[in-house]
Amino acid sequence: MPNASQVYRSTRSSSPKTISFEEAIIQGLATDGGLFIPPTIPQVDQATLFNDWSKLSFQDLAFAIMRLYIAQEEIPDADLKDLIKRSYSTFRSDEVTPLVQNVTGDKENLHILELFHGPTYAFKDVALQFVGNLFEYFLQRTNANLPEGEKKQITVVGATSGDTGSAAIYGLRGKKDVSVFILYPTGRISPIQEEQMTTVPDENVQTLSVTGTFDNCQDIVKAIFGDKEFNSKHNVGAVNSINWARILAQMTYYFYSFFQATNGKDSKKVKFVVPSGNFGDILAGYFAKKMGLPIEKLAIATNENDILDRFLKSGLYERSDKVAATLSPAMDILISSNFERLLWYLAREYLANGDDLKAGEIVNNWFQELKTNGKFQVDKSIIEGASKDFTSERVSNEETSETIKKIYESSVNPKHYILDPHTAVGVCATERLIAKDNDKSIQYISLSTAHPAKFADAVNNALSGFSNYSFEKDVLPEELKKLSTLKKKLKFIERADVELVKNAIEEELAKMKL
């Protein structure tokens, strides 16, 4: 019998109904438009954390965490261990997410957590390698005893502002009974990101280049999930950051890096700084903190698309008129899709007296208001509640570029360390927070979300003044150099229209030989 942290409910539901882990993963988005969450966050005591978990490998730690959220009846121990082992065998680092400590000589408490050692050189591989294997595991089990004509197939539809698309494609390419459609805004992702997605030859993969913004693409995906007829006909699944399995998989590196930065001792204080757009990455840190990991604070680092920074300062969640194109395009969003999950827990604690159903009703009302008016205002208690766990910093394009330059010049471990622009947003915010912090013993872990090679223009613009710098020699891995020579496979969608996208998906599904 699953416990309360192994069943899931919608953030917008005022019904007591819960579903299984498998249903939450395959379905992705709730039919009422809400996101799936465990109503109870499991607790881990300090003795277990520092006597046991601190000594575990990344893979064993992932198993210990995931076991708390996945019932044994759904995935037995041996199967879960195998899924985890296969998911992280594709990484270039034995540690999976290594921590580069004391990067600059002058700040011994600034550490960079490298999350880009997976197949697509982005943090999203940590989750999407696991999600791809999960989808295949559930489908194979479902289809094992079904005749050929009745086997279940999943159509994964996702939107990307850059890295999610390639990570999803690499996680799902060649998987049996899964077809993948990734939408991205034409001309708004880096050339390498586009090449990574469009050069995958597997028949079950198709990229759709949409005239418009990332938010247009995300709105289309949400509309497809809300279309019951299309959804039912094609069994649509989600791998965007709304999929609960992605949040779950990302929790591991908060625990793992915390133990590295503190040598497994509970006496040191740690703050995490996370470049944030859709809020999925930092939300995993929130779950780690609520489970018992003694994180002092989670700092949201935003670029000029600063809905999260504005919310924490005012309590007003307001969609801007347009997206600002920045040097950190994966964070160029108007609406932060995972923020709804945090709002549910805050609403339950501060407005609903611990009532799950009431919390769902409150969140649903907020998001209906957002849909109608483009904004909603929350009670002061919600801002105060959020501020207990979160702080935020907004970083400009100029500061992003300056930080890439500064770290290249000042880094000693290793020398000439190169940041991608998203990581630079985080490091700039980190340095600001360190300067403001009276307690100089606090360790700061700044999350590095992508390899600098994926953002050549931003990196080159920042570093072109250094005579000894060469993008080809210092930054670009051999594997990524080859991409430009490969044949591209993509379909253009002339305007951001859900019907055009649905038609394109159906045309391609008819051609695919799954």
Swiss-Prot record:
Ligand binding (pyridoxal 5'-phosphate): 277-279, 281, 449
EC number: 4.2.3.1
Cofactor entry: pyridoxal 5'-phosphate
GO molecular function, one term: threonine synthase activity
InterPro entries: Ser/Thr_deHydtase_PyrdxlP-BS (IPR000634), Thr_synth_N (IPR029144), Thr_synth_N_sf (IPR037158), Thr_synthase-like (IPR004450), Threonine_Synthase (IPR051166), TrpB-like_PALP (IPR001926), TrpB-like_PALP_sf (IPR036052)
PROSITE patterns listed in its UniProt record: DEHYDRATASE_SER_THR (PS00165)
Modified residues (Phosphoserine): 467
Gene Ontology cellular component list: cytoplasm; nucleus
Function: Catalyzes the gamma-elimination of phosphate from L-phosphohomoserine and the beta-addition of water to produce L-threonine.
Extra remark beyond the main annotation: Present with 26000 molecules/cell in log phase SD medium.
Assigned protein family: Belongs to the threonine synthase family.
Protein name per UniProt: Threonine synthase
GN (gene name): THR4
